[in-house]
């Protein structure tokens, strides 16, 4: 683990109450297999990023009801430099507020990774490494999965992606659209360049113009959203 300035900062927002998940424990710690819980699957790409040789700082945004999650993350101290910050109650009580809380602690490129999203498909664990290297020229790159289920897209960051391949770009983007027709994908992770990172909270604003339009896209086969149990892709 490096204590020097990071090449990439990963924001991990863990302050939510998991109302839709409906369990009496933190959804991040829901068991998927012996010794593996949801947040472990969510962090696979982050660990791969650190093992690629880049210096990675993980900024975990939490509240006191998530101290069990904080304790679980101690097992990642060997691979990741971690900073824990209590979500600022003076900010909006949502994803945007969590991002704003974390931003003063970020350096370098900034990635947003959600603790209830797990990538699936061959090579998906390398997708964040690829996305970090593809933020230019727009200053943005998304890890995304194509999916056409309207119910899924209404609960996610919906995208319209252009042609498949290494040159895929975001043509349109909207957070949890009421009318998802015209969208064919959703993002699982977002990476911003240092000059664009201050705009990260905007991706969580419903009905607002999204800074993700024009972003590069790294495609994965799919991802599981453990908050709503829907899987695009």
Predicted regions and their residues:
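Conserved beta-strand scaffold positions in the cores of enzyme catalytic domains, especially
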Residues: 29, 84-85, 140-142, 214-217, ...
